[in-house]
Structures are given as structure tokens and as C-alpha cells.
Amino acid sequence: MAILNLTQHAATAEQVAQGVIDLTGDDLGTMKALLTFVGLPSAETVHERAYEVAKLAQAHDVESVMIGGAPFFMGALERALQKRGIKPLYAFSERVSVEKVIDCVVVKTNEFKHIGFVEVWL
């Protein structure tokens, strides 16, 4: 199953292995412009942009999309996608603690490991 990436970030190797496809070219630029809000948006702007993003996804003939970003936008985007028969998914990651020895010093970092997707139910 192909999952179209509708986030502003490139899919990770783990996500690609699970079927995520990144947008490219003009479609990527259009999507990023629609997802970038400068200043406080009106409800009308939020809904118009959600509609446009959903229309972009529909043009790619996919059943599922990976979404994520500004919380105030996600609800409108979920509904716009579902009205077009497209299933919105959120990536789910687990934080993994990793210890590395660098110059005889143990450095502990957190990395995020992609586990799967959470389907939106309305």
C-alpha cells in the first residue's frame, strides 16, 4: 500500500520501507506552501488550505497519506481527506536511548525509531 507523505519532512528509511512516498518537484513546493502559515490564520484560510492539500493528494490516486504538523490544521485536513476517501495516518515513533563512547566519554542521546502508523477515526 502506497502512503503519500503530506508532511514538510522527507520520509525516513523506515517509513519508505513501509510504503511512504515523498512528493517531488512542483507538488512538493505547493504542499509546503500550503502547510506554512505566517501569522494567525482565519478559520476560512485553514479550511481552504486543507481542501487544497486534499485535492493535491487525490491527484496522486492514493488511498492513504501520512500527515503531521500544526495541530490547528490537522483536524481540518483529516476531514478534507476523508471526504475524498483518503485515509489520514500519523507516524508513530518510540524514543530509544543510545549510548556512544566519544573520546572516552559516554554520550547518551535519544533517537526516534519509526514503529508504524496510527489511523484517524472520525
Task: Report each predicted region and the residues it spans.
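Long, low-complexity, Lys/Arg-enriched
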Residues: 1-64, 76, 83-122
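Conserved residues at the C-terminal ends of beta-strands
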Residues: 68
